[in-house]
Amino acid sequence: TGLAIDPVRQRLYVVDTPSHDVKVFDLASGMPVKTLGRRGEGEGEFNFPTYAALDRGGRLYVTDSLNMRVQVFDAQGGFVTAFGKHGDGSGDFSAPKGVAVDSEGHIYVADAGFDNIQIFDGKGQLLLYLGGAGQSPGQFWLPTGLFIDGRDRIYAADSYNSRVQIFQYLNVQSTGKPER
């Protein structure tokens, strides 16, 4: 379902939802390099993974949809950690979908069940969330895909509202003023 490209290591990550794994390809040759995961509930195992994203250090974040978590792998494909669980509390997931990482390492997860985007720190602790159910700007109806560009603009595919919403993350430098 999801794709992520690592231009530094020349790798293409393909989330293969029905196979419950992530296939890694060499960008130059198109040849397979390795496969991450298999069906299961353990570390590095998946139950219908859907989306993937990379941070600046080459860590891979994979939405493990039916295990209700995000799994993190190092640049070599080794399991690092996972966060999230099914529930209705802060930081829990109902239907995790898209995942993206900003320039400061914050992890964004679109949750189609809660109609929001949850933002986590690098340790998987919830910082805040955006949205809620609705059709107004800043509200969502089944958000799915996420992408964050090089200027920290957050693009959210708001599926049933038939739109893409764009948000801007404002970095606060040592001056205390938002960066533009």
Residue spans for each PLM region:
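Eukaryotic scaffold repeat domains enriched in small/polar residues
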Residues: 1-180
